[in-house]
Structures are given as structure tokens and as C-alpha cells.
């Protein structure tokens, strides 16, 4: 699948779609044009590769007491961006560039927003599911933010975080809720 340059598409309404098959991979599209892929490497933990028409990045979660996600140019050693995870808010810092806030859009909505430090929304990312499976997501960008050079990296970094969080929640599903396995049958008392 050929990827087209991000600057050549409408950046107001984008969508992430999960690929078919067992591989964990998503494609970011605008209309019929694919602009990026995000693919997890089998057996490599949280390591993922994002590919665009112009660049290839690696993303990885790190830290335990101070969790974070880094994005680097593939094969590079320095961070292009870092998403620092805090209890009530998260922060995206771009190397040599601006910083952004990344947080839930609301308590009951699984959507996330990326805003400037002044509170100006840059992107709204909303996961889409079928049952309990994450199948994609919508990325809505205000017209005033559509020409930001870092927009594609922000969309990839935000989606990476959302997918990891979703998969961690999926791992807990068998332990809770109405779909939880039935407890073993007990023998009747004598």
C-alpha cells in the first residue's frame, strides 16, 4: 500500500483503521488516501514502527515510576517527541519545539484531546470499537490546526498511547464483567 504525503490530503477528518489478520497494525487515512501506518513488532513488547511517505519512526513505552512514550526516527538515538504520563494529565514534548497537553475529553467518553498549553485544541481522537475490540478511531482536527508541521507525529503518538491503553484494558476483561468465565462448579454438600 502506497502512502501519500500528509501535506497533500485533507487533514480535518482522519481515521485510523485496524488491519485484517492477527498482526496489530493500523492505517491512518484521509478519504481514500493512506498517510501513515502504525505496526507493532511481534514479540517486541511495546515497540512499534510508524511509517509515513516521508519518514519512519519507532515508538516505545518506557519507565515504571515515571511512565513515558518516546518517538524516534527509525535507527536514531535521540527522541523526536516524548509523551510523559501523569495521573491527571499527560504532556507531549517535541524536541526543539512546542509542548502539548494530552488528556481525556471527558469522564464518560473514551476520546482524547491534544491541546496547546493555552488550551487551544489541536486534535480530538476518538477510538471506535466493535464489542470490546478496538477497530479504529477518528481524528478530528480544527481547521486552524491542520497546517501544524507536527500534526502527523502528534496523531501517531496519541494513537499509540490509546492502543496500548486499550490492549491493557482488554487483557483484564476475562477477569471482570458479564463476559467473565464462570467460576468452577462446586460439589453439592453431602
Question: What are the residue ranges of the model-derived segments?
Answer:
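Low-complexity or membrane-interfacial segments used for flexible interactions
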Residues: 1-36, 44-46, 54, 86-91, ...
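Acidic (E/D-rich), amphipathic helical modules within compact regulatory domains
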Residues: 37-75
